[in-house]
From Swiss-Prot:
One of its GO terms (molecular function) is hormone activity. The lineage of its organism: Eukaryota, Metazoa, Chordata, Craniata, Vertebrata. Belongs to the GnRH family. The modification Pyrrolidone carboxylic acid is found at residue 27. Keywords: Amidation, Cleavage on pair of basic residues, Hormone, Pyrrolidone carboxylic acid, Secreted, Signal. Residues 1-26 form the signal peptide. It is found in: Secreted. It comes from the Eukaryota. The keyword Signal applies. GO terms for cellular component: extracellular space. The modification Glycine amide is found at residue 36. This is Progonadoliberin-1. The keyword Transcription does not apply.
């Protein structure tokens, strides 16, 4: 009997604690956030102030500044995968004929 009472009290305390901690840690859509954690960026310049946003120089081509590649590596990976699949098929005796 005492074990059941203790278990019920422990369950009640855990539920209350979980509810209180969940309310304190989670973001809510009414604070400028959309459901899913997405923030609306329309009022970003008013939030940050025009001085901060206006101080960044406009760059016409960001790849020159950041040094990013002109071509994404993903097409190269897919071409390599196709090549390796074709080689593997030939080694296994399978022939692929194009019409």
């Amino acid at each position: 009997m005492a074990a059941q009472t203790f278990a019920l009290r422990l369950l009640l305390v855990g539920t209350l604690l979980g509810t209180l901690l969940g309310q304190g840690c989670c973001q809510h859509w009414s604070y400028g956030l959309s459901p899913g954690g997405k923030r609306e960026l329309d009022g970003l310049s008013e939030t940050l102030g025009n001085q901060i946003v206006g101080s960044f120089p406009h760059v016409a081509t960001p790849c020159r500044v950041l040094g990013c590649a002109e071509e994404s590596p993903f097409p190269k990976i897919y071409r390599m995968k196709g090549f390796l699949d074709a080689v593997t098929d030939r080694e296994n005796g399978n022939r692929t004929y194009k019409k």
